[in-house]
């Protein structure tokens, strides 16, 4: 029994979208998404090599992309991809055994086999039930896959969020297979330890602001110095989790959400505001503006937690857990990129003649034209979501919890557009912004 092919519905084309999405764009997007699904691997290389085609196409579609723009962005992503691996049919027939499935988790060569397994499960049970069983059920398998959802700078959970947001079973299957075949930087240990500590500590009557926890990360020498430049791409595994795992879990455990719908909504908005703030406020005095590559992912993924908390078929306590894990990992990622010094002026005072007059619709139009893998479009769309979700909390009793205020959202979106436009992929962002080394790039000289 095969999963339904991708068929985008005009009524489910994103929670942040333009008013009119061309019908021929839906048709083109369906075709390109199926071609990617059938022909290409989820990973263009075994480590840190995610196929971004789905993310890019669905994001720009929601921002009003034409069929040509969709094809152009597809073409941007194709050169680095590799063919989807062959299905191991012998293993496929055994994956319904939980022990065998558990042993297969983390095997990137089995992506296609896992994809076919999850497509079968979705065809038999429905995509919502498959998510319940394999992500949310709090079994050993579900907790293992849930932790892997947050691996790779949130790529699997972004994929899952898109599958839910656009209500596409095949995209959900891809997300499950991506998480199940993903490598491991041991963030599951961080989640487990933080959750255990939160479970035995007495909850504070007034929650500590996430931005205060960010400041505590920077002030904690054990955590701040844990990632080293020489760790390169393993700063999470070897640095924050490896050298400061206990301290990081203890600090992260302080981000807690009561099982209350309004508290969940506010806390999700707080997470979004905090991520946007440290992404934009982490500049380097005397150098050109540039957004950190990893902090950018904290923002792009944040939109999907707005999607998750709106799913009434997911139990409240499970939606709470999804957001708690996101914020706790955000704190760790802030440390991974060097616990950069933060200053609101970099966002609030941002001005550039090239973009000062641009509104959201102008930015959507501009970013859809960019040769990109979707990161800039995702970032801008997530900021628009943040503006909408956070505005009611930015003044009044929760003001101190929300560092992004008013037009800072639009200014940060303009900064993204200005600093990524017409640049090659390796110069659109800066990696590990809290370290001095990446800021020595010649293109960042004032």
Curated annotation (Swiss-Prot):
Top-level lineage group: Eukaryota
Pathway membership, UniProt: Secondary metabolite biosynthesis
Short name of one Pfam family: Questin_oxidase
Family matches, as InterPro entries: Questin_oxidase-like
Keywords: Oxidoreductase
Phenotype of the disrupted gene, per the record: Leads to the accumulation of chrysophanol.
Oxidoreductase among keywords: yes
EC number(s) on file: 1.-.-.-
GO molecular function terms listed in the Swiss-Prot or TrEMBL record: oxidoreductase activity
Function noted in UniProt: Baeyer-Villiger monooxygenase; part of the gene cluster that mediates the biosynthesis of the dimeric xanthones cryptosporioptides. The pathway begins with the synthesis of atrochrysone thioester by the polyketide synthase dmx-nrPKS. The atrochrysone carboxyl ACP thioesterase dmxR1 then breaks the thioester bond and releases the atrochrysone carboxylic acid from dmx-nrPKS. Atrochrysone carboxylic acid is decarboxylated by the decarboxylase dmxR15, and oxidized by the anthrone oxygenase dmxR16 to yield emodin. Emodin is then reduced to emodin hydroquinone by the oxidoreductase dmxR7.
Family affiliation: Belongs to the AflY oxidoreductase family.
Name of the molecule in the record: Baeyer-Villiger monooxygenase dmxR6
The gene coding this protein: dmxR6
């Amino acid at each position: 029994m095969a999963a339904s092919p991708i068929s985008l519905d005009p009524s489910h084309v994103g929670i942040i979208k333009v008013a009119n999405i061309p019908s021929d764009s839906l048709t083109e997007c369906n075709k390109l998404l199926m071609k990617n699904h059938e022909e290409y691997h989820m990973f263009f290389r075994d480590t840190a090599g995610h196929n971004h085609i789905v993310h890019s196409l669905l994001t720009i579609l929601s921002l009003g992309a034409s069929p040509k723009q969709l094809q152009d962005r597809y073409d941007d992503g194709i050169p680095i991809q590799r063919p989807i691996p062959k299905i191991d049919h012998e293993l496929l027939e055994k994956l319904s055994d939980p022990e065998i499935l558990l042993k297969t988790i983390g095997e990137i060569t089995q992506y296609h086999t896992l994809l076919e397994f999850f497509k079968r499960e979705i065809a038999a049970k429905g995509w919502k039930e498959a998510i319940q069983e394999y992500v949310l059920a709090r079994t050993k398998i579900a907790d293992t896959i849930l932790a892997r959802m947050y691996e790779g700078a949130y790529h699997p959970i972004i994929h899952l969020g898109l599958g839910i947001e656009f209500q596409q079973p095949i995209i959900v299957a891809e997300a499950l297979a991506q998480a199940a075949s993903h490598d491991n930087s041991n963030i599951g240990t961080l989640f487990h330890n933080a959750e255990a500590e939160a479970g035995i500590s007495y909850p504070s009557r007034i929650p500590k602001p996430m931005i205060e926890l960010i400041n505590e990360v920077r002030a904690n020498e054990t955590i701040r110095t844990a990632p080293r430049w020489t760790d390169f791409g393993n700063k999470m595994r070897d640095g924050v989790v490896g050298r400061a795992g206990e301290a990081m879990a203890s600090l992260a455990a302080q981000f807690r959400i009561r099982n209350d719908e309004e508290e969940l909504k506010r806390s999700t908005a707080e997470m979004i505001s905090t991520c946007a703030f440290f992404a934009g406020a982490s500049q380097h005095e005397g150098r050109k503006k540039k957004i950190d590559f990893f902090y950018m992912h904290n923002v792009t993924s944040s939109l999907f937690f707005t999607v998750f908390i709106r799913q009434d078929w997911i139990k409240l306590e499970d939606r709470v857990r999804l957001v708690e894990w996101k914020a706790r990992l955000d704190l760790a990622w802030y440390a991974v990129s060097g616990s950069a010094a933060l200053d609101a002026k970099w966002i609030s005072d941002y001005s550039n003649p090239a973009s000062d007059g641009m509104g959201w619709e102008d930015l959507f139009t501009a970013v859809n034209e960019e040769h990109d893998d979707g990161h800039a479009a995702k970032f801008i769309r997530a900021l628009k979501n943040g503006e909408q979700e956070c505005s009611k909390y930015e003044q009044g009793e929760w003001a101190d919890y929300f560092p992004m205020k008013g037009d800072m959202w639009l200014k940060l979106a303009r900064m993204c557009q200005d600093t990524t436009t017409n640049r090659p992929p390796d110069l659109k962002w800066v990696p590990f912004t809290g370290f001095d080394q990446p800021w020595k790039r010649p293109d960042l000289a004032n």
